[in-house]
């Protein structure tokens, strides 16, 4: 997390907390399906989150803008960007297999 804060000191405490919660969530999901490479978990923030946030240095999304992340895979760069830009609408799209599994898990969780 220090790495994220080093390059993005403007992040609010709420945003930092959300970024801090990402790794445990990915570890949990990675134990069920291969969301991201398991060998990358040790470098989660540098290889995935920081890499996704590098877009911020090149392009600034405006409040209310709608962004489509096609082929999002494990949710990168869409999820980190959605945390960074809370007033921008992000839609993440991936294969039917990935979406179906996620939908099934969400349905099972809701039913229990």
Where are these regions (language model features)?
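Conserved SAM-binding motif I beta-strand of class I
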Residues: 89-94
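Conserved SAM-binding loop of SAM-dependent methyltransferases across substrates and taxa
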Residues: 74-86
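Conserved small/polar residues in nucleotide/adenosyl-binding loops
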Residues: 102-111
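Conserved Rossmann-like nucleotide-cofactor binding loop
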Residues: 98
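Class I SAM-dependent methyltransferase Rossmann-like catalytic core
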Residues: 36-42
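N-terminal auxiliary segments of SAM/dcSAM-dependent transferases
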Residues: 1-24
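Conserved alpha-helix/loop element of class I SAM-dependent methyltransferases that forms part
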Residues: 46-63
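Conserved class I S-adenosyl-L-methionine
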Residues: 64-71
């Amino acid at each position: 997390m220090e790495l994220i804060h080093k390059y993005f000191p403007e992040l609010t405490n709420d945003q930092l907390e959300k970024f801090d919660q990402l790794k445990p969530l990915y570890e949990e999901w990675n134990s069920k399906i291969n969301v991201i490479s398991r060998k990358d978990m040790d470098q989660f923030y540098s290889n995935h989150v920081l890499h996704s946030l590098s877009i911020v240095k090149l392009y600034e999304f405006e409040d209310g803008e709608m962004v489509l992340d096609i082929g999002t895979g494990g949710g990168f760069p869409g999820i980190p960007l959605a945390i960074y830009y809370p007033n921008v609408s992000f839609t993440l799209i991936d294969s039917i297999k990935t979406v179906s599994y996620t939908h099934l898990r969400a349905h099972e969780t809701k039913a229990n």
